């Protein structure tokens, strides 16, 4: 993709407005339109970006429901931990390093297209395999029988159950991995990197809130479609369900192809003519030609700011993964207690999660909250997510602690902690889904906004590579560490019910929250200083490394 400041020699300057004029028009919107600060000249560009982001968000939201359904019905909640460690972590690391290698010779735009093409092919392949799954997949009971009636269930062998189940249901495992990779690579990394390179700092800041609204409309639509999917699924026989699943994946493949065509039109038609002349405050610095991944990591090792960004991503993902794992086990236990089909019972809470998340995020972005980073400060918005995480410890993990005490299945000291009574599974499940949703809401509306606004202040020379480190590597590392913790508790406590480890889980998350808050305070000072002086954020590294960042350039125009 061409850099946003290009082609300035191709068009007469008098035909192109300045960025300040565009900003003045966009910021003059009144009423509900003040939350869609898009100038008339930017309508087509924003519409194409919004449609792309909406499609990407819809696929991810629906895939999340599908992957949980496959795990609950075909495998066990504990297999999620195994998949995240032994499948997703190495795959994501390999793909992140592949992206870094490709950045040496290809643009972010080109890499984005390549990965979209790869996922489209994968979805088409899955759609075809569903039609012949019975002929090509191993017997559903190939490994399950080994763990029936206590077979191989000793403490030294029970941990292998998760591994065998992932092999027993390979298609379910592939669906789970593809959903995670689509979310982390395409949605969270490649599209946002593409957006970063397509916009100036001020344009990016205006586009992000309405784009978040669009992707949450997709989330709401996904929950609605999922509800219809589960109702239809109940009426169909097995083979008919296979045809339905095949159609869903083939349709998703065509949606990805549509994203590729929209991107091509955006670059070759809409962005062919520059939209405005970039002001000095938004002017990008020329990127250094060849920056290796090892060089990026070397500079990062000297940068307190990038280390802090990586740590907050790490702490969020570990904490979220621990809460999610506890929640999903609680859903399975409750489904068995109420004698309900696990896939349907899990799907109900997934839809509640998506409805709640989408509606609240849309409302927040149609309110003054969407500009709180600018009006109230980075620190206030940055602290929201760790505070919600702390509330999840008290209320959700507290309810899980109470239920394990009532079941007398918790740690010894926990079993006698509360007076006698019945387990409150409904309370635990609803606390769980509420805080799962709140963590997503604060991630999308606060955590990610702070991270992206700070990321836009990083020198463009290293921005994409650094983003792949703190979002790509540390994001997946956090999820995997959370999963490793789950497997360790699974083995150490000789149980498949991670709620037994609730006291340990709560203590670890609390320690993370303390360090998380300290990192946010540091990042806030750096961001506010950069905004105040209208410059790149100081990534807090040695003077020798800083010298390689500055390269002067002439004023340019933006696509």
Curated annotation (Swiss-Prot):
The task this protein performs is described as: ATP transporter involved in the uptake of ATP from the host cell cytoplasm. Provides the microsporidian cell with host ATP in exchange for ADP. This is an obligate exchange system. This energy acquiring activity is an important component of microsporidian parasitism.
Task: List all annotated glycosylation positions.
Answer: 8, 196, 290, 403
Q: Name one GO cellular component term.
A: plasma membrane
List the protein's name: ADP,ATP carrier protein 1
Gene name, Swiss-Prot/TrEMBL: NTT1
Q: Which residues cross the membrane?
A: 46-66, 79-99, 111-131, 174-194, 210-230, 242-262, 305-325, 354-373, 377-397, 425-447, 473-493, 503-523
* Family according to the record: Belongs to the ADP/ATP translocase tlc family.
Stretches of Polar residues bias are at 1-10
Keyword Transmembrane present in the record's keywords: the answer is yes
What is the taxonomic lineage of the source species?
A: Eukaryota, Fungi, Fungi incertae sedis, Microsporidia, Unikaryonidae
InterPro entries according to UniProt: ADP_ATP_car_bac_type
One Pfam assignment: TLC
Gene Ontology terms for molecular function: ATP binding; ATP:ADP antiporter activity
Q: Which organism is it from?
A: Encephalitozoon cuniculi (strain GB-M1) (Microsporidian parasite)
């Amino acid at each position: 993709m061409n850099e946003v400041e290009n082609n300035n020699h191709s068009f007469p300057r008098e035909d192109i407005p300045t960025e300040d004029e565009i900003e003045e028009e966009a910021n003059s919107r009144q009423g509900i339109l003040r939350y869609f600060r898009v100038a008339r000249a930017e309508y087509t560009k924003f519409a194409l970006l919004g449609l792309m982001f909406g499609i990407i968000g819809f696929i991810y939201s629906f895939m999340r429901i599908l992957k949980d359904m496959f795990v609950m019905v075909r495998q066990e909640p504990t297999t999620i931990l195994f998949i995240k460690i032994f499948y997703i972590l190495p795959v994501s690391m390999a793909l992140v390093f592949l992206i870094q290698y490709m950045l040496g010779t290809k643009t972010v735009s080109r890499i984005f297209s390549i990965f979209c093409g790869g996922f489209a092919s994968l979805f088409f392949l899955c759609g075809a395999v569903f039609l012949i799954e019975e002929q090509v997949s191993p017997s559903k009971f190939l490994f399950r029988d080994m763990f029936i009636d206590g077979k191989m269930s000793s403490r030294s062998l029970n941990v292998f159950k998760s591994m065998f189940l992932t092999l027993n249901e390979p298609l379910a495992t592939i669906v789970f991995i593809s959903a995670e990779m689509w979310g982390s690579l395409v949605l969270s990394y490649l599209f946002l990197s593409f957006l970063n390179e397509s916009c100036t700092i001020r344009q990016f800041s205006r586009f992000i809130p309405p784009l978040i609204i669009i992707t949450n409309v997709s989330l709401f639509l996904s929950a609605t479609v999922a509800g219809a999917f589960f109702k239809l699924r109940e009426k169909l026989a097995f083979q008919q369900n296979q045809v339905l699943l095949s159609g869903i994946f083939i349709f998703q493949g065509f949606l990805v192809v549509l994203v590729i065509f929209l991107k091509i039109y955006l670059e070759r038609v809409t962005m062919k003519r520059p939209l405005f002349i970039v002001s000095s405050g938004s002017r990008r610095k020329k990127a250094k030609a060849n920056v290796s991944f090892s060089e990026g990591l070397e500079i990062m090792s000297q940068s307190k700011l990038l280390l802090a960004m990586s740590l907050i991503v790490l702490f969020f993902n570990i904490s979220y993964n621990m809460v999610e794992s506890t929640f999903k086990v609680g859903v399975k236990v409750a489904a068995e207690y109420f004698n309900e089909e696990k896939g349907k019972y899990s799907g109900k809470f997934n839809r509640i999660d998506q409805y709640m998340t989408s509606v609240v995020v849309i409302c927040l972005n149609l309110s003054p909250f969407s500009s709180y980073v600018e009006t109230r400060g980075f620190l206030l918005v940055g602290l929201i997510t760790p505070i919600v995480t702390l509330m999840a410890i008290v209320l959700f993990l507290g309810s899980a602690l109470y239920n394990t005490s009532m079941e007398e299945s918790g740690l010894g000291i926990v079993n006698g902690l509360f007076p006698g009574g019945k387990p409150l599974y409904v309370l635990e499940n609803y606390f769980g889904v509420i805080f799962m949703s709140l963590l997503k809401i604060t991630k999308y509306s606060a955590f990610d906004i702070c991270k992206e606004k700070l990321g836009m202040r990083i020198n463009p020379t290293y921005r994409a590579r650094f983003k792949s480190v703190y979002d790509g590597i540390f994001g997946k590392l956090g999820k995997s560490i959370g999963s490793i913790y789950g497997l360790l508790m699974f083995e150490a406590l000789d149980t498949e019910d991670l709620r037994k480890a609730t006291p340990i889980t709560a203590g670890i998350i609390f320690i993370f929250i303390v360090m998380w808050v300290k990192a946010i305070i540091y990042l806030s000072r750096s961001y506010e200083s950069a905004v105040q002086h209208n410059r790149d954020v100081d990534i807090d590294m040695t003077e020798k490394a800083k010298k390689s960042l500055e390269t002067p350039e002439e004023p340019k125009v933006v696509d």
